[in-house]
Amino acid sequence: MGICLDELRLQVIRPTLQHLRAWNLGMENLLLGTAAQESQLGFHLKQGRRHGLGIYQIQPHTHREIWDHYLIDYPPLASKVRGLASQRDFLDHPHSELTTNLRYATAIAWLIYRSADVHKIKEADAANVTLMAQLWHQHFHHGPSATTQDFECSYAQLVSGADPTDSAPRYAGAQLPAHPPAPRNSPGSGGLNGRGARQPTA
């Protein structure tokens, strides 16, 4: 897992949606699920040669479309979103905000859903993971490989079944030794003179 679940929810997603006057629990959960599926809650910010960026893996062309074809019709909303971005860097490197600015990236992720007429999720469906998976796959997903089942599995593992205060990455590879190695110059360590000296489809 990447970012602490509770902190991502309470310090990033919720205040961003509140700033945009768009908060409801269902949308908050949908964005958490989107981050879980796209980047394992921020474990990956740029995956190999894929074009997606940040915790939501938003593609640059999608980012441009939101500004050029959607926000252009909503000046007050555009002003609120622009206020979340860096004052100067945004003008020179707008797409880098998707990686470095969590609240801005969250606003753009929400706008991707909003531009598809997904404004809010009913309170009764706030925990409906099947519905969220369908919304993600229909309006957000930009590659052919992942499925709604993948979204549901990511949500179950990283959102529903996660310790919300756990910020440690869950790595199943080689484990650290139970005892740290002895200092180089201590007896038996070998030392320097001893003998026993890692959106279009990407």
Where are the predicted features?
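Sec/Tat-exported extracytoplasmic proteins
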Residues: 16-20, 38-39, 45, 112-117, ...
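Substrate-binding/catalytic groove segments of enzymes
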Residues: 65-68, 89, 93, 113-129
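Substrate-binding/active-site groove segments that recognize
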Residues: 50-88
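Long, charge-rich low-complexity segments
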Residues: 148-184, 190
